[in-house]
Amino acid sequence: MDIETIKDNIDTERIYTELQTFVVNEDQFQDQMDDSHLSVQICLQGINAEMDPYFGSRTLKHIADEGFKEEDFNIFLFPELDYTNSIIEDLLMFRTRVMILKPKTCLSYHADPRKRIHIPIDTNENCFLMIDQYAHHLFANGSAYLCDTTKPHTPINASLDSNRMHLIGMNQQLS
């Protein structure tokens, strides 16, 4: 199965509010948020509390080559995200990021080394996760989904004017 629901009743509006208040509206992210062609990736967990939450995941492009495992990304970078961090802890997630896909964009078709947990926070009917050439719509209805991203996949935001925001991480036991 490509996608399965693993948790319900997550207050995604509360997560959205926390992310908007403490993360997305930070001055350091405004250039990226204002660029209509750039998808934004913000780390919520890092290898240490001093890790830069925006550039951390990109500078460690090949985590294994740098001597780290994905499980090493387990330190909360935004301790003020009380509810969001409690959901991350409840799902035993690590290397959790906020992924914002701008309108009329997609990422390259790729496969990840592990399955990913997706919690859609802000989405619309024109957003899809293509897995192995099948389009799936993940609803922002308070569910956490385990997605088999070890298969070739890409997120697509075919909206004309709305961002797609997902909380994405991993769980050792579910990968």
Regions found by a protein language model. Give the residues of each.
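Non-heme Fe(II)/2-oxoglutarate
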Residues: 1-88
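A short glycine-rich, His/Asp/Glu-containing loop-to-beta-strand
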Residues: 83-103
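Short, conserved beta-strand element in jelly-roll/cupin
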Residues: 100-101, 111-127
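A short hydrophobic beta-strand segment most commonly corresponding to one strand
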Residues: 117-120, 144-146, 160-175
